[in-house]
Amino acid sequence: MILGLALIPSKSFQEAVDSYRKRYDKQYSRIKPHVTIKAPFEIKDGDLDSVIEQVRARINGIPAVEVHATKASSFKPTNNVIYFKVAKTDDLEELFNRFNGEDFYGEAEHVFVPHFTIAQGLSSQEFEDIFGQVALAGVDHKEIIDELTLLRFDDDEDKWKVIETFKLA
């Protein structure tokens, strides 16, 4: 079973992000807009209850987090991915760190760059065309997210499904 942890924003911000993703993100139908807290990790089916309990314990003391999407950015030249950058806060970093150590299904492969992906799977030409448009449009959105979402990848439907949400203090 493949799981992941994410912060999922309000419906209104999901709609704003999805207005780009529908056009520019080939993964659009697989998952809602989100900030990844724990990248996909694999567990045995029988370990799900244990993972749920570990998540509950690890979020203890973490307050609801402010998410501030500040501008369009990209992972170029490493990757032709365009995203809305989220300002990194101590609370966001703490949440990420609690789930990305050897004691919870391994360390993160990448440095924590909180963001909402809006375009991926682009050719270099597509990237150049789209990035300019998105950067000009800009973004400045703040909201409080008070739940951490545990997701499971459903192979049959080829998409991520919510298993459980956990209230942040």
UniProtKB/Swiss-Prot annotation:
Gene3D superfamilies: Cyclic phosphodiesterase. InterPro entries: 2H_phosphoesterase_YjcG-like, Cyclic_Pdiesterase, YjcG. Pfam families: 2_5_RNA_ligase2 (PF13563). It is an enzyme of class 3 (hydrolase). It comes from the Bacteria. Its EC number is 3.1.-.-. A motif (HXTX 1) lies at residues 34-37. One of its GO terms (molecular function) is hydrolase activity, acting on ester bonds. Coiled coil: none annotated. The active site is at H34, H115. The keyword Hydrolase applies. Keywords: Hydrolase. A motif (HXTX 2) lies at residues 115-118. Belongs to the 2H phosphoesterase superfamily. YjcG family. This is Putative phosphoesterase SAOUHSC_00951. It comes from Staphylococcus aureus (strain NCTC 8325 / PS 47).
